[in-house]
């Protein structure tokens, strides 16, 4: 059974959305486990703030890269479909 571009694209999008949702859930769990700020020393408070920023930045960078890779794979898949079509139905 041949996979269409639309099926391939939709599957990549679904996987990306699912992965993003799971990553957001993990981040939410981490942030929920943070101690009450009133119990933290100024140094630890600063440490947590830096760590939270780092997690958010890395999450954004990772999601951007995943999106770029997905778009690249979609483009390559479309090219392969065109090559397959050209091989099956060569111009005369």
UniProtKB/Swiss-Prot annotation:
Its main location: cytoplasm. Keywords: Calcium, Cell projection, Cilium, Cytoplasm, Cytoskeleton, Flagellum, Microtubule. InterPro entries: KMP11. GO terms for biological process: cytoskeleton organization; defense response; positive regulation of cell population proliferation. The keyword Calcium applies. Gene3D superfamilies: Apolipoprotein. It is found in: Cytoplasm, Cytoskeleton; Cell projection, Cilium, Flagellum. GO terms for cellular component: cytoplasm; microtubule; microtubule cytoskeleton; motile cilium. Coiled coil: none annotated. Binds calcium. Monomer. May be involved in the regulation of the cytoskeleton through interaction with the subpellicular microtubules. May be involved in parasite mobility and attachment to the surface of the host cell. Behaves as a strong immunogen during infection. Belongs to the KMP-11 family. This is Kinetoplastid membrane protein 11B. It comes from Leishmania infantum. The lineage of its organism: Eukaryota, Discoba, Euglenozoa, Kinetoplastea, Metakinetoplastina.
């Amino acid at each position: 059974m041949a996979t269409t571009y639309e099926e391939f694209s939709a599957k990549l999008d679904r996987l990306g959305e699912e992965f993003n949702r799971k990553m957001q859930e993990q981040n939410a769990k981490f942030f929920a486990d943070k101690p009450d700020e009133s119990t933290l020393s100024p140094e630890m408070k600063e440490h947590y703030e830096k760590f939270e920023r780092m997690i958010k930045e890395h999450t954004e960078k990772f999601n951007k890269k995943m999106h770029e890779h997905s778009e690249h794979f979609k483009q390559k898949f479309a090219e392969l479909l065109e090559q397959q079509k050209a091989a099956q139905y060569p111009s005369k």
